[in-house]
Curated annotation (Swiss-Prot):
Protein known as: Tetratricopeptide repeat protein 33
Coiled-coil features, chain-numbered ranges: none
Superkingdom per UniProt: Eukaryota
Residue spans of the TPR repeats: 59-92, 93-126, 127-160
Disulphides: none
Regions of compositional bias (Basic and acidic residues) in chain numbering: 238-258
Annotated spans, Disordered: 231-258
Lineage: Eukaryota, Metazoa, Chordata, Craniata, Vertebrata
Record key words, sorted: Repeat, TPR repeat
Protein encoded by which gene: ttc33
């Protein structure tokens, strides 16, 4: 704070001693004011620290109460407790991760994904948050995204056998099943398209009836020009009526016998 100094007005005569006296008093007052300002700022800072400590302690208490309520099956009340705790400590990733688990338990999948995403944003190295996010994404049907979340969690903590054996392997099996189902569906659609391309003929139309009649007449004429010849041995031979002679093996044998 700037020190107050006596300023001589124009036309006035002030002795040097009086002027120095006022300046000394002003300097003393400025020192007192500065010390009061320091005490006031320190008090404000201490008050903020106390409030912050109170918020952290209260948030921890609400978190624990919410956990007990969730274990007792009172999910809605647990969510209320955790929402209050989030208002006090919005940077606590564990609160969002616990909230995501309970939201999945009450089948609110999309809010669960949002809560888990917030958890990994607050703490990107939180393995359980990535695991919960992957499970929520699986429940939403986003298998590829879930596999990515599980892989990130394993990259952070490769020793997490549960994440590897249960979550990631299960997600990969679901992905293979989805691919097989999609492949079968594509084949079925291709068969339907092929069937649609085959024209549906009207077999009772005049053109088809006329063609069938012509084929029938041609077959009758061909049959009429054939003659059945029965040999002595009982075998039958077909020959055209236009031929004058019919020679068989049996007749040759008959002539030789005579």
């Amino acid at each position: 704070m700037a020190s107050f100094g006596w300023k001589r007005k124009i036309g006035e005569k002030v002795s040097k001693e009086v002027s120095q006296h006022f300046e000394e008093e002003a300097a003393d007052e400025s020192v007192v004011l500065d010390s009061h300002d320091v005490d006031w700022l320190h008090a404000i800072k201490r008050k903020k620290d106390v409030l912050l400590e109170d918020n952290v302690a209260k948030s921890k208490r609400l978190k624990e109460e919410g956990g007990l309520l969730a274990e007792d099956g009172r999910q809605k009340e647990a969510l209320t407790k955790w929402d209050e705790a989030i208002q006090l400590t919005p940077g606590d990733a564990a609160l969002y991760e616990m909230k995501a688990q309970v939201l999945m338990g009450v089948h609110e999948i999309f809010p669960a994904v949002q809560a888990a995403e917030t958890a990994v944003q607050r703490n990107p190295h939180f393995v359980e948050a990535w695991q919960t996010l992957g499970r929520a994404q699986l429940s939403l049907g986003e298998i590829t995204m879930a596999i990515r979340s599980f892989q990130i969690g394993l990259h952070i903590c490769p020793a997490n056998t549960e994440l590897w054996e249960q979550d990631l392997n299960w997600a990969r099996q679901l992905l293979l099943q989805k691919m097989d189902t999609e492949s079968a569906e594509r084949k079925r659609r291709d068969v339907n398209i092929t069937r649609e391309q085959i024209p549906d003929y009207d077999f009772e139309s005049d053109e088809v009836v006329a063609a069938c009649d012509a084929i029938s007449q041609k077959q009758k004429m061909a049959a009429a020009n054939k003659t059945v010849v029965v040999s002595a041995s009982g075998s039958e031979n077909l020959s055209d009526r236009k031929e004058d002679k019919v020679e068989t093996n049996d007749s040759k044998e008959f002539i030789k016998a005579r």
